[in-house]
Amino acid sequence: PLFSPIVNIDGTPYLDGGLADSVPIERALEIGNEKIVVILTRNPGYRKKMPSKGVMKIYRSSYKTYPNLLRTIARRSIVYNRTMEKIEKLEEEGKIFVLRPQMKTVSRLERNADTLTDFYNHGYNYMKKQYHNLLEYLQKEE
């Protein structure tokens, strides 16, 4: 959130909705989606850590007029980790199809072209391997 500005639309401030719900699987189920494909950017087993006191201090300073945003940021890792548990359970049950890197992901700030190319190629090749499984999932009758 610190790197993306708050945008006001008709007087209402907005930030990336991923802060509140990084992977809206519950919403997809609520509205009745039957074939759900989830594309994650983190490797299996990844869990978010709680923000440190120092980081929370920076957030409090930057967003002191947005107490709900601060609460959302403070509990983001808890919500994210519960969502990942739900996704893993649904994937295991065959109710959703999940694509995710099978290797540790690169940093959002990564600039090394070789590292980025390797990660891109990993994703491309992994999808080629999973393509048949994805089609099978999408064609499967419930």
Named regions from a protein language model:
Residues 1-142:
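Patatin-like phospholipase
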